[in-house]
Amino acid sequence: MRKRPQQQRAKVIVDTILEATQICIAEYGLMQVTTPKIAEKSGVSVGSIYQYFENKDQIILELLRRKSENLGLALKQMAMVKEQIELKALIDMSLQFGFDVMREDNGFFIEVLKYWHGYNNSEAAEILEKHFLEVGLYVFNRFYPHWSFETLKNKSFVIINS
């Protein structure tokens, strides 16, 4: 971001820009999103958008960063709240969670996944990898406590990156 918002009003403007960007991606597709379309959907002028973001790609990267953080936290919460659940049920729930996320927000994540190769080195990808690794370590440690930490870490890494 060009300028991190400090005041509440500025934070609301940035949130509005990001919400409009998400809607535009779901509505027009990732490659057809433009700053003028974001401005129109958000009700924020193009000039005001450029006070906070250098370009459309920076807006999208910030949106993906935030969505990835929220997705990772939701997955962690789901995995850690269900302490008494069996492994198979947890796997089923995790898969259903993934499908549900894909359907949310008018297919926003489906559209992003089509072009994920362009974002796989982004901060958003790093955030997701960190959360998935932590969930993997938690689950493996819970169901396979006899495995060493290195084994857990390596198996989690292989599964996450497969």
Locate predicted features.
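Short hydrophobic clusters on alpha-helical segments that form packing/core surfaces
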Residues: 17-25, 67, 71, 98
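N-terminal intrinsically disordered/low-complexity leader segments
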Residues: 1-12, 146-147
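Membrane-interface starts of transmembrane alpha-helices
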Residues: 6, 148-160
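Amphipathic alpha-helical packing segments from all-alpha helical-bundle domains
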Residues: 69, 73-75, 89-96, 100-107, ...
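Helix-turn-helix
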Residues: 12, 16, 24-58, 62
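A short, mixed-charge helix-start or loop-turn motif at secondary-structure junctions
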Residues: 2-6, 53, 80-84, 118-122
